[in-house]
Amino acid sequence: MKIIKASEMGIGPAENRTKPMVAFVIACIIVLGNVQMTSAQTARLLPTASGTGACTDIMAYGGSPANRDNGTALAVALKASSGDGRCVYFPPGRFTFASNFKFMLPNGSASITLTGAGADVTQLYWPAGGGLTIDYVGAQNSVHLRNLSLTTGSVGVGTAVLLNQTNGDVGVADNALNELSGVTIRGADGYSQNDYWDRAVEIKQICNVNLVGLVISGPGGAAYSDKGIGVVLEGSTSNPAVVFNVTGATFDYLSKGIVYGQQVQGLTVSQSNFVGDDYGIYVPANISGLDQLTVVGSQFNCATAGIYVGSSLSNTLFSANLFIVPNTGRGIHLQQAYLYSAVGNSFNIGTAQGKTYPIAIEVGSTAGGGTITGNLFDSMVTAILLDRTSSGANVQSNEYSNDLTTVNNLGTGNTVGGGTP
């Protein structure tokens, strides 16, 4: 058997191996020397949002979980970023703010990002309410809140996030995209405990907003809550609020999950949950300028109504949703109905039947017709109630199981069964 020498295997004599070894040791020493930097030095070297896209660490500007008020540190960190893009990172920990933090975007094209290490990993905490207020000055402004929690130590005080357009004549064309992603809003004492915000998110005269993975928790202690509001959308005649996408969100134990205000259009809710609320999605009476509501693939268990429409809201679509309807209310209540479709939803009882409730779908005064088809109704007192002021409803091909009344048609010009052309 031939024995291969080391030199034949590509490994030279010992004297030839010393130089690579020395070079390797020297390289390691250099690398280790460069690593020995303080966290503050590292943070200050992070590029800002106007540079390569990374964020400034608030710890580099005096922010700390040990501070009683991090408002000054956040203001300094935001101002330290140059250009139109400003980004501040909050590491793990609870950062206290003594009062409302208000920031006005400096020009018509400015944008900011506040990001954390993850919801509940990073907390922005207001012992006495307060929250964040961001004032816009133009249509190209945008705000991005990501991966953090906003908590309060108070009961029913303050708004956690207020996005406010101060320019009175922006219109709806070509607005920049805004987002809340991976954000949790709750009391500092935990989920569905005692503390809660009066309003979690308020969006005034802002367009193009994505709410993704948003979690809002109100006060617990009962099967259904009548305190706290999740998201409030508000527009105006000169600045209608248009295009809102709510995806993978959770609204628990609130008086109302999502509330329409004046001049709101284009809300889409998908893959979201409304549990323990009084109302899930709420459109109050006597408001105008409303259009387009789409709710798909979501689940509701609400005391009074999963979805309530009290003003004329045209072009509404409800499809592939699950409604758990207790004996205190309705699944869908269209008090003002206008060009609506309820297709492929499931309505199941949440408690024992009462004398009047649960009602799965109730349709009131109708400005335009609608379709109710392909739905499943189980153990409702009344599956479908068409009020005396209803008209133009087309009710076809639904499945009924153990319902005391399938369709109660009190209106005029409604079609129940019999197929369509």
Show the residue positions of the predicted features.
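Bacterial N-terminal signal peptides
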Residues: V22-N34
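Boundary at the C-terminal end of the N-terminal hydrophobic targeting segment
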Residues: T38-A40
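Acidic Gly/Asp/Thr-rich repetitive segments characteristic of extracellular carbohydrate-active
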Residues: I58-P91
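Leucine-rich solenoid repeat scaffolds
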Residues: T373-P421
